[in-house]
């Protein structure tokens, strides 16, 4: 008997909603990345986009452990000489909490065409409301580790 290889048409996708309230950012990102890639399914294959949709709510209430709120910086460059900009994690969390959570999760996905397709299934919202109620998302509980 030959080994089963999943095809793109064989995939059934479910919607998961994760509440990010008081969940450490890195632990949230690991769980969401595994759901997006489909690593929780027995039919996982690294070359097939077999993951589920993930909706994250309350991104503004995510926990940042340690001194990372003031001590860790995110950088980007304009492309011009002297154009390096930096912001602390706390500044980004106050201004765009959904981007901070999205950047943490997308950084754990493959850096290729498949990774870009997988990241389109991630939806992050700063508040408790989301427009995906029609998809009937299943709540996903993250087991909390003592901080």
From Swiss-Prot:
Q: How does it assemble?
A: Part of the 50S ribosomal subunit.
Q: Which GO terms describe its cellular component?
A: cytosolic large ribosomal subunit
Please give the function described in this protein's UniProt entry. Answer: This protein is one of the early assembly proteins of the 50S ribosomal subunit, although it is not seen to bind rRNA by itself. It is important during the early stages of 50S assembly.
Q: What is the protein named?
A: Large ribosomal subunit protein uL13
Query: NCBIfam families attached here?
Result: rplM_bact
Annotated family? Belongs to the universal ribosomal protein uL13 family.
List GO BP terms, alphabetically.
negative regulation of translation; translation
